[in-house]
A protein has these predicted regions:
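Acidic/polar-rich alpha-helix caps and helix-coil junctions
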Residues: 1-270
């Protein structure tokens, strides 16, 4: 990893995420790529996933990596104006579903809901649109899926840009495991043992059922690119979600000769 130190080498990423300057967001296609907790895609799951007509249902029973990468939906009351830290629960139980969940799977100073901007002002809800923002221009997106993978509240962020000192991973074990899985699949050597050494270790911490190699066939995901074998499609999916927001996707699409994927019409939360 790359170490940062106050007064020596600093950066501005974790502050930027909590400002109106951030334009990092995801598409519906990216959100749909995350599996449900039963290890099935959204097209064939039997979990409590509720479809894409309601964002609470859309995020329900999903891979925890989705919640830690793209801010889950919530809503709170702001009774003293937008530029304050105070908040209260609404009378709708759904509005706190993911507030409660994130309190159990995250730390005190990262990925807790409701989110706040760099000055500590509580954001009223997600999805939070740049053009419809309750007077709060921060932590917002154009299409409703705000990426907050690098969000935390323990980094100094209130006074100036470029003073953050959170260290930056350069090569982490998750990348090693998805590299191994893809290489084994391309060599036609990806079996259950290979899955257990790689993908299933990643899924264990993401609250997703294990990959069972023999269960993956052409019917596993009806929305699969038909030119990609079913097992390779699932291995590539795992790589996509594990490394989401870390700068790998475009190079991967070039390597796979799948540049046409970027021509899809981007869709948002609604």
């Amino acid at each position: 990893y790359k170490a940062y130190e106050t007064g020596q080498l600093m950066h501005g990423l974790t502050r930027m995420v909590r400002t109106g300057e951030s334009y990092i967001e995801a598409t519906k296609d990216a959100v749909d790529s995350y599996l449900c907790t039963d290890g099935r895609p959204v097209s064939t799951t039997t979990s409590r996933y509720g479809g894409d007509k309601n964002m609470y249902g859309q995020f329900r029973d999903r891979d925890y990596r989705l919640y830690l990468t793209i801010c889950p939906p919530y809503m709170v009351k702001k009774e003293n104006g937008p530029s304050t830290a105070d908040w209260k629960y609404t009378d709708n139980a759904q509005d706190r579903e993911f507030i409660d969940l994130m309190a159990t799977i995250s730390g005190e100073t990262y990925h807790r809901l409701p989110s706040s901007n760099f000055k500590g002002f509580t954001v009223q809800g997600q999805p939070h649109f740049k053009n419809m923002n309750w007077g709060q221009g921060w932590n917002a997106s154009q299409m409703g899926f705000w990426v907050w993978k690098y969000y935390n509240t323990h980094t100094v962020a209130t006074n100036a840009n470029g003073v953050n000192t959170t260290d930056a991973p350069l090569f982490r074990i998750g990348e090693v495991m998805v590299n191994y899985a893809e290489a084994m699949c391309e060599l036609n050597k990806f079996d259950q043992a290979a899955a257990d050494k790689s993908i299933n270790k990643l899924r264990a911490r993401a609250n997703v059922a294990k990959m069972v190699v023999n269960d993956i066939n052409d019917a596993f995901d009806p929305k699969r690119d038909p030119s990609v074998p079913a097992l390779l499609w699932e291995v590539r999916r795992e790589r996509r979600v594990e490394l989401m927001g870390e700068g790998f996707r475009l190079d991967d699409l070039r390597r796979w000769k799948k540049g046409d994927y970027v021509n899809k019409q981007p869709l948002g939360a609604y």
